[in-house]
A protein has these predicted regions:
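Histidine-centered divalent metal-coordination motifs
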Residues: 94-100, 199, 203, 264, ...
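C-terminal regulatory/interaction regions
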Residues: 1-16, 287-329
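Metallo-beta-lactamase
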Residues: 59-69, 164-175, 183-185, 190-286
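Short Pro/Gly-enriched beta-strand edge/turn motifs at strand-loop
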Residues: 30-38, 160-167, 187-189
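Active-site HxH/HxHxD metal-binding segment of metal-dependent hydrolases
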Residues: 67-71, 76-185, 212, 269, ...
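N-terminal amphipathic/basic leader segments beginning at the initiator methionine
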Residues: 4-34
Length: 329
């Protein structure tokens, strides 16, 4: 591990100890028995990190990538090569989004492995994947019409509806629930579950005090602020408050010197600085938004978007931006 450390890579109070990213089929060991693999995504965010944990005579996999032929081929390459044909004992998914859960069912079936996931995300994932092929509900149309969507935007929403499950292999019919403070033993070491909310309903991070490693999923990412959106399924929810509360809680229970292994970008040190930046970023946005909303505004108004986002909002990110805008309002 130490040969790959580059202590001088530092920015915004964060330190990135690895000067290279994993190549196809060649994971990098970031801590004893903890390996970082990287897979391609067909989205604007073009990659996901998945984590391989050595577990006696086999492996534990944390997060899985989307269900596509290229992703399956990447896993097959790892099985035959780096993983040495050894069994996978457990598949653990941090949360319900397709880039994390997409191949969980396939991996579990392939190895007859145990499947671990939080209850809320498991059930929500099955519900949303079950919408495939269904007609858009009137509640959704009413929700986005109230947000300011015009007929063209509503048509695009209708066309998108039911697409959540297109890159998700059917989930296992049974799972092992993970919840706050649960402990999972892997290779003789205890990994504690730390739950966050806001980006996903019940996002599970894995923290190992002995290794001083936090597998953070999308809950803490060094150079991306995870999307926090309000959806028509819970129109009176407050996911942004959930997110900020989760950041405060994690800062209080996880030490600052932990190695953070995120789902995107690179492993880093500086957990508390990053959590502070995430909290401050949203609170500053709320302050500016309060000023802008002295006059009536819609969630999708340009002035609202300009307060919340540094980039121009195009069609490819419009729905995510609208959801985040609604969460802030």
């Amino acid at each position: 591990v130490t040969e790959k450390i580059k202590a001088t890579s530092q920015a915004h109070g964060l330190r990135y100890p690895f000067d290279e990213k994993p190549q196809l089929g060649e994971p990098i060991e970031v801590a004893d028995g903890v390996f970082w693999a990287r897979m391609d995504l067909p989205y604007t965010l073009d990659h996901i990190n998945v984590w391989l944990l050595r577990d006696g005579d086999g492996w534990v996999i944390v997060d899985t990538c989307v269900d596509m032929d290229t992703s399956r081929a990447h896993w097959e390459n790892l099985f035959a090569g780096f993983m040495g044909g050894k069994p996978v004992h457990k598949v653990i998914v941090t949360h319900m989004h397709p880039d994390h859960v997409g191949l969980a069912g396939w991996l579990v079936n392939h190895f007859d492995a145990d499947f671990h996931m939080s209850r809320t995300d498991y059930l929500m994932c099955r519900t949303m994947a079950g919408d495939t092929g269904k007609q858009v509900p009137e509640e959704g149309l009413r929700f986005y019409r109230a947000a300011g969507f015009n007929d063209e935007a509503l048509e695009r929403y209708s066309a998108r509806f039911g697409g959540f499950g297109q890159h998700i292999h059917p989930l296992p019919q049974a799972y092992k629930r993970v919840k706050q403070d649960d402990e999972i033993e892997i290779d003789g070491h205890i990994w504690r579950i730390e739950i966050g909310s806001g980006h996903a309903p019940e996002h599970a991070c894995l923290y190992c005090p002995e290794k001083n490693v936090l597998i953070s999923g999308d809950q803490v990412i060094p150079r991306i602020s995870s999307n926090v959106s309000l959806f028509p399924t819970e129109p009176m929810g407050n996911p942004l408050q959930d997110w900020i509360d989760s950041c405060h809680r994690l800062r209080g229970v996880i030490p600052d010197d932990v190695l953070v292994c995120p789902a995107h970008n690179e492993p880093f040190y500086g957990l508390h600085a990053r959590l502070n930046a995430l909290i401050d970023g949203h609170e500053n946005s709320l302050t500016r938004l309060h000023e802008v909303c002295a006059a009536p505004r819609r969630a999708i108004d340009g002035k609202v978007f300009s307060v919340l986002f540094k980039r121009k909002i195009g069609r490819e990110v419009f729905f995510m931006a609208a959801g985040e805008s609604l969460a802030h309002l």
